[in-house]
């Protein structure tokens, strides 16, 4: 409900001042209701002011101003919500189709919006939600004078359905076959990555290219894991299309360039079931691991029920196989498993052993499995490759280890030299744990390590809900001249961590290609006394992105 808390019209005459207060009906207007001409004029002026300075967006009274969600009001004061707000805050599954249709799912509610319903503002799509707030589990209060909107959840946050299958929403790519190679990790990573663009866009990415161009010194038989995939994607090595580098021939083209750029990925630890389901529902398939007591071509195991395509392992072996979780069923009968777990419920998983395995390549894994979803990754933001012109980095191998000062806070910095006249557009880094608060700074006139103290300027801040890889866009223009040295600094506070800085470092044989000569990084506890990262045989995981002038 819209409340106009104070409208004061002051008319100055020769001897009198007349003050006008809003009528009761003006205080209790409903958004979109008809109004008289004078009141409508007042509202339009308020809406114009809000459009210029932005809406103060709150959830249960807490401001979201630091998160950058661009919710808008149309000329009837009805809410227009972008995809990131619908997913992150309202906990909807947002599916966009090639014909322009958008489907919103929340709990058991499914809403369809045609292309004519959607507003496109500054190349961003907005969904009109005012008429559907009750169906989506929210009440909203309005304060147009202050330009404030407060969302109040009224369904207890119960937004997940009891069962969800991405196959039923056109959100999976075809099942593939890894054959005899140890490339399940790459199939799982790319299967998860492919799903986040569906149903709008179907792409099949090259497993060979990821497996053979990731910077790590492992061959196709030695396996891998999600940090390798993340490093490959974050460093713009890929992805590339399968058609340009086909699987299984043992050859690759290292000169291919990425057809998409990864901006964000989140990591969920410790099988937090609601968070796993939420990530699948809102973003797409998740890459995770389990122990498979069978291998490709041999689908016999005491833990696998062929008749029901279900798997449950209750032993102590560590994970040895990666796959993609694409859904769940809370009521999946425990009797379908061999042996029988203590509870109903299963994740729906996409494997990489071809369609002859399971139910055309899919199978059910019990919630009670010893390893499933103990660590999971979901790719949440993928853009076209022209989002930035240039990348500056010294951590091709990405997050190999962590360092810090036995405290949950730290500063870290990287120094770069502009290769041409450019504009700084964004920075990226890893949050090594959930609920990380961060601030981003720049030093544009870097001379030596002392510059990290005196000349830094804050250019961003925020908080991450999950561990993961994050890109922070910079809203102000920071111009760099060719040959100019500049430093990016990030401060983090990661609750419960003693080493909150992600670093590239020696990780054994797989990191034999580690290069510590390509960076100039520094670390500090409070941002006052700095230490060289390279002198500790590490590179700081902190990238910068620029556009050419």
Name each model feature, range by range:
Residues 85-86, 131-134, 427, 486-492:
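Extracytoplasmic/surface-exposed domains of secreted proteins
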Residues 1-11, 20:
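N-terminal Sec-pathway targeting helices
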Residues 107, 150-155, 381-383, 445, ...:
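Short beta-strand-to-coil "C-cap" segments at the C-terminal boundary of structured domains/repeats
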Residues 21-22, 26, 155-425, 430-466, ...:
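Catalytic-core signature of thiol
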Residues 435-516:
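Aromatic- and Gly/Pro-enriched, solvent-exposed loop/edge beta-strand patches characteristic
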Residues 19-160:
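Primary recognition of N-terminal secretory signal peptides and signal-anchoring hydrophobic helices
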Residues 491-549:
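Short, surface-exposed beta-strand/loop patches at domain edges
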Residues 120-122, 133, 281, 342, ...:
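Surface-exposed coil/turn segments at beta-strand junctions on protein surfaces, enriched
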């Amino acid at each position: 409900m819209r409340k106009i808390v104070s409208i004061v019209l002051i008319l100055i005459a020769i001897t009198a001042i007349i003050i006008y207060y809003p009528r009761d009906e003006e205080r209790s207007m409903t958004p979109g209701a008809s109004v008289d001409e004078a009141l409508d004029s007042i509202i339009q002026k308020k809406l114009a002011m809000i459009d210029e300075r932005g809406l103060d967006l709150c959830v249960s009274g807490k401001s979201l101003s630091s998160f950058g969600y661009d919710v808008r009001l149309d000329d009837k004061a009805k809410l227009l919500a972008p995809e990131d707000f619908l997913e992150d805050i309202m906990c909807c599954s947002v599916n966009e189709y090639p014909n322009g249709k958008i489907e919103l799912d929340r709990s058991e509610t499914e809403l369809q919006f045609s292309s004519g319903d959607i507003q496109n503002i500054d190349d961003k799509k907005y969904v009109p939600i005012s008429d559907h707030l009750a169906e989506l589990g929210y009440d909203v209060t309005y304060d147009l004078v202050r330009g404030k909107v407060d969302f109040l959840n009224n369904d207890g946050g119960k937004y997940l359905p009891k069962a969800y299958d991405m196959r039923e929403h056109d959100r999976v790519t075809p099942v593939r076959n890894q054959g005899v190679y140890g490339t399940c990790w790459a199939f799982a990573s790319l299967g998860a990555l492919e799903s986040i663009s569906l149903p709008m866009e179907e792409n099949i990415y090259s497993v060979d290219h990821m497996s053979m161009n990731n910077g790590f010194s492992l061959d196709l038989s030695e396996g891998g894991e999600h940090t390798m995939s993340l490093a490959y994607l974050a460093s713009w090595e890929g992805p590339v299309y399968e058609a340009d580098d086909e699987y299984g021939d043992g050859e690759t083209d290292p000169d291919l360039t990425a057809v998409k750029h990864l901006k964000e990925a989140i990591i969920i630890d410790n099988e937090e079931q609601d968070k796993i389901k939420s990530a699948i529902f809102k973003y797409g398939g998740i890459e995770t691991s389990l122990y498979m007591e069978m291998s490709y071509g041999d689908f016999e195991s005491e833990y696998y029920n062929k008749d029901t395509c279900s798997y449950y392992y209750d032993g102590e072996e560590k994970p040895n196989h990666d796959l993609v979780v694409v859904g769940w069923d809370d009521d999946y009968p425990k009797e379908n498993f061999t042996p029988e777990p203590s509870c109903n419920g299963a994740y729906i998983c996409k494997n990489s052993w071809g369609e002859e395995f399971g139910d055309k390549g899919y199978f059910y894994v019990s919630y009670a499995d010893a390893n499933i979803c103990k660590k999971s990754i979901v790719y949440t933001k993928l853009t076209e490759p022209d989002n930035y012109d240039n990348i500056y980095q010294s951590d091709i191998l990405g997050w190999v280890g962590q360092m810090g000062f036995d405290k949950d806070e730290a500063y870290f910095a990287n120094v770069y030299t502009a290769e041409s006249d450019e504009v700084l557009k964004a920075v990226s880094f890893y949050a090594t744990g959930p609920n990380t608060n961060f601030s981003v700074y720049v030093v544009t006139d870097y001379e030596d390590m002392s510059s990290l103290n005196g000349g830094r300027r804050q250019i961003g801040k925020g908080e991450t809900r999950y561990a993961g890889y994050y890109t922070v866009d910079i809203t102000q223009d920071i111009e760099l001249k060719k040959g100019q040295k500049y430093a990016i600094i990030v401060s983090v506070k990661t609750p419960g961590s003693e080493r909150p800085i992600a670093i590239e470092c020696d990780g054994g044989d797989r990191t034999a290609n580690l290069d510590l000569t390509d960076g100039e990084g520094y670390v500090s506890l409070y941002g006052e006394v700095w230490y060289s990262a390279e002198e500790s045989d590490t590179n700081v995981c902190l990238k910068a992105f620029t556009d050419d002038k």
